[in-house]
């Protein structure tokens, strides 16, 4: 494989091309991209954990340093002002020398408010992208050039198409996350609490809680019915029934987002349902290809859910087609089949149909689907179907004409297991689909 430095060089060529195009379209001279600033907790003197501007880390793998600035015009070498204060209170990152620094002009910025003296005098035609518009106004950036929607829409749209460098980083993030999942399963099998399982995961991936791309979902038993469960009980339950882990990792600013579900026992209905969801997820991925709308795959999985509900006699005396048509599958899989993945976990532009930002909303029947784009080569997405037993979603079905089709006794028996989710990260190619997760032998 090409070195990361060679891949990065081509990555910058691609970003420069996109920059030239967007500057010409919106008649701008350059973009000033801000890494971000630290924000203190209200009435306190310590800051929230720093989260870098995604548009900044698209250019440089600098994810932990606030008060950095990047000036790009699509022609000249991108220029990075790297915040390098004299500070004995806090650690200071050294001026970077890495695989990527040959392609970027790196200049030390000793004072956070010192960027004004470094920029071109004429700034009326520079666009600012960042989280501190008041800072841009202080730098005499025109108000209408602060986070201009058209520019951001354009950049977001093309972020769906990953460069080879980005794909290489995402494969590395997968490796880290997979090692974490193995460690977490081992911790679960040994009877640990959610809190301790999370520590095992973080240790294996080399992350802190603030480093992971999203809060880890470490859910034992009925907690697996809470889609974004992040509480982390310190005490292990008296009986281990099930474990749902939705946890990722980050490499050079790019995310992995994986989910696995395990049954404590292998000889019950729940264990068989986990196996069947896994099999159907793999079967769906095998059908994926460029040129098909992501919405179609979401709808197809509801048909697969119907098949499983019927097989396991959770819904009875109703055809699979009627189940989907009347949305009896809805309470069992209330979220979308997945989402775009990249610099952000829920990566941008999932609904954009073109580089002008034309929006196509999710179908009204499936409002929580996060992507309506037609799949194209170089797109990276998650495929994460699930079946859950969530009382608040099932309750409305306990009355009315369809209630008789629900096997309430079976549902009550499965509720203590919470639910099931299986999530892989896939790359669309010209000639098929790459499953980055399964390629690393994560069962």
UniProtKB/Swiss-Prot annotation:
Annotated Mn(2+) 1 binding sites: 257, 339, 384, 423
GO BP field: proteolysis
Catalysis performed (reactions): Xaa-L-Pro dipeptide + H2O = an L-alpha-amino acid + L-proline
GO cellular component: a single term: cytosol
Cofactor names: Mn(2+)
Positions bound to Mn(2+) 2: 246, 257, 423
UniProt entry tagged with the keyword Manganese: yes
Coiled-coil residues: none
Protein family (similarity comment): Belongs to the peptidase M24B family. Bacterial-type prolidase subfamily.
Name of the protein described by the UniProt record: Xaa-Pro dipeptidase
Organism field: Salmonella arizonae (strain ATCC BAA-731 / CDC346-86 / RSK2980)
Lineage of the species this protein comes from: Bacteria, Pseudomonadati, Pseudomonadota, Gammaproteobacteria, Enterobacterales
